[in-house]
Amino acid sequence: MAKRLLTAFYGGTFDPIHHGHLQPVIALAQLVNLKQVILLPNHIPLHRPLPKATPQQRLRMTRLAIADTPGKLFVIDERELRRNTPSWTVETFKVLRSEYGPMAPLGLIIGQDSLLTLPQWHRSQELFELCHILVCARPGYQYGIAGYKNNNWMEYRFTDDPSALNYQPAGLVYCAETPELAISASDIRGRVHAILPYYDLLTHSVHAYINKQGLYR
């Protein structure tokens, strides 16, 4: 197969979006030579409580965050935010695959923590027919293939060659050595509520927006 440009997607609640979301993905983009990462903020998350901020507020914070980020790496896709039901990743990628065509390399960005639970995801094996999995490191989680030595349908998918992601449309797992930032949205919300400093955990514009809107108080 000829080399094609990989398009990567990164979903989340982004309640609020912070450096722990953005900086590892920026590092991943440099390692994999991504020209664009498409953010997929969701409306109703799976397997976690409803967001504290409204969809409109979370979308605004996401726009502010990428405006504060140098370059034009990030863009936003609002399709999951417009849904009034939870968004299954495999269903979103079925639609994306139909839009991008059968041969375009597509990637889903997740954290090392999510990789551990990937075999339990809804129709996870079907997901590998639709996209690659690009994994960012997470604090406290062992890097890379550890834990999959006895998982036959996962182990053979791992590659340490990022260029391989451009030569097939889906099916590979690439674990990137990205910054491990111990930042979480729940910690930020807790800090806001407790009137503790948090300005260094997210971009300036998002910090200002949270204060102006009185979010998470």
UniProtKB/Swiss-Prot annotation:
Molecular function GO terms recorded: ATP binding; nicotinate-nucleotide adenylyltransferase activity
Gene3D superfamilies documented for this protein: HUPs
Catalytic activity: nicotinate beta-D-ribonucleotide + ATP + H(+) = deamido-NAD(+) + diphosphate
InterPro entries: Cyt_trans-like, NadD/NMNAT, Rossmann-like_a/b/a_fold
GO biological process, one term: NAD biosynthetic process
Pathway this chain belongs to: Cofactor biosynthesis; NAD(+) biosynthesis; deamido-NAD(+) from nicotinate D-ribonucleotide: step 1/1
UniProt function note: Catalyzes the reversible adenylation of nicotinate mononucleotide (NaMN) to nicotinic acid adenine dinucleotide (NaAD).
The protein's name in its UniProt record: Probable nicotinate-nucleotide adenylyltransferase
